[in-house]
Amino acid sequence: MTDAFKQQIQAEARQAVEELLEQAKLKKGDVFVVGCSSSEIVGGHIGKDSSLEAAQAVYAGIAPVLAQRGIWLAAQCCEHLNRAIIMEREAAEQYGWEEVCVVPRPHAGGSWATTCWKQFKAPIAVEEIRAHAGIDIGGTLIGMHLRRVAVPVRLSLSKIGEANILCARTRPKLIGGERAKYTEE
């Protein structure tokens, strides 16, 4: 992988997370889930062409932006680990999410989860979370880890590298019927 392509991936990842955060209105302590197929980023087929370099470039683009705002990064593993989440122990404890025992590797968990495991201060795996927003890079199906109600968010870019991206924020359920008043549009 060329340095130019790594820089492109990093810049696109940073731009995507910044645009989504602008629309999602997350606050300090919220959780942001990222599912990332490094295979799709480099133009391969999901699960077949894992790239630590691509995953590291995504991490370099996303992690500092979230850390600056005090937002927790949750990294979704691949389907071989049942799409478990890698996150900081402190975040899991804050939300009461139960730890499971596994250490991701590029071909069992994915390069993205492996990269995050190596970068986090005190990484743990959890089976399921309810994130406040997230980015799906390359068709990784993050919906199972989003709070209800998920709201699609369109960004100015539609790809990171060669991978399609889909983004979502969440909002509380609107209840009460026609006489109710809501604070959100």
Language-model regions: role of each:
Residues M1-F32, L52-V65:
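N-terminal glycine-/serine-/threonine-rich phosphate-binding loop
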Residues R69-A131, G138:
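Ligand-binding beta-strand-loop-alpha-helix segment within the catalytic cores
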Residues E18, E22-K25, A63-I71, W117-A125, ...:
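Generic secondary-structure signature for well-ordered alpha-helical cores
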